[in-house]
Swiss-Prot record:
HAMAP family the UniProt entry points to: Ribosomal_uS11 (MF_01310)
Cited InterPro entries: Ribosomal_uS11, Ribosomal_uS11_bac-type, Ribosomal_uS11_CS, Ribosomal_uS11_sf
GO terms, molecular function: rRNA binding; structural constituent of ribosome
KW Metal-binding (keyword) present: no
Pfam families to which the protein is assigned, alphabetical: Ribosomal_S11 (PF00411)
Protein name in the entry: Small ribosomal subunit protein uS11
SUPFAM superfamilies: Translational machinery components (SSF53137)
Protein species of origin: Streptomyces coelicolor (strain ATCC BAA-471 / A3(2) / M145)
PANTHER family linked to this entry: 40S RIBOSOMAL PROTEIN S14/30S RIBOSOMAL PROTEIN S11
One Gene Ontology cellular component: cytosolic small ribosomal subunit
Disordered: annotated span: 1-22, 114-134
UniProt keywords, alphabetically: Ribonucleoprotein, Ribosomal protein, RNA-binding, rRNA-binding
Length: 134
């Protein structure tokens, strides 16, 4: 039987260092079921992120514009702690939270430089799934 007490070395916990980034990118992925907002530095390293589910919405409420607004506010506040002031917005997907997420980024104090739609569209690539009959 092993002796009581510590078996191994204690795990070292490293605190996240505070990045000081003034300009970055905000990637908003808005699907029919959820909205994910990632704020990165210009090279693509994620500084902060939030989603409608991460903020506390469940089920069909994740797909609402209000949930997208709350997710964008949460991500923007965390990015501002790292010194973020200006973002270029890249929007992807057909969801309902696209415009409200951009508006809430502006409302939290981030300056929006440009807005680009980067939704992937196939040039008749893969065959889509069969139609739903409800």
């Amino acid at each position: 039987m092993p002796p009581k007490g510590r078996q191994g070395a204690a795990k070292k916990v490293r605190r996240k260092e505070k990045k000081n980034v003034a300009h970055g990118h905000a990637h908003i992925k808005s699907t029919f079921n959820n909205t994910i907002v990632s704020i990165t530095d210009p090279t693509g390293n994620v500084i902060s992120w939030a989603s409608a589910g991460h903020v506390g919405f469940k089920g069909s409420r994740k797909s609402t514009p209000f949930a997208a607004q709350m997710a964008a506010e949460s991500a923007a506040r965390r990015a501002q702690e790292h010194g973020m002031r200006k973002v270029d917005v890249f929007v992807k997907g057909p969801g309902s939270g696209r415009e409200t997420a951009i508006r809430s980024l502006q409302a939290t104090g981030l300056e929006v430089g440009s807005i680009q739609d980067v939704t992937p569209t196939p040039h008749n690539g893969c065959r889509p799934p069969k139609r739903r009959r409800v």
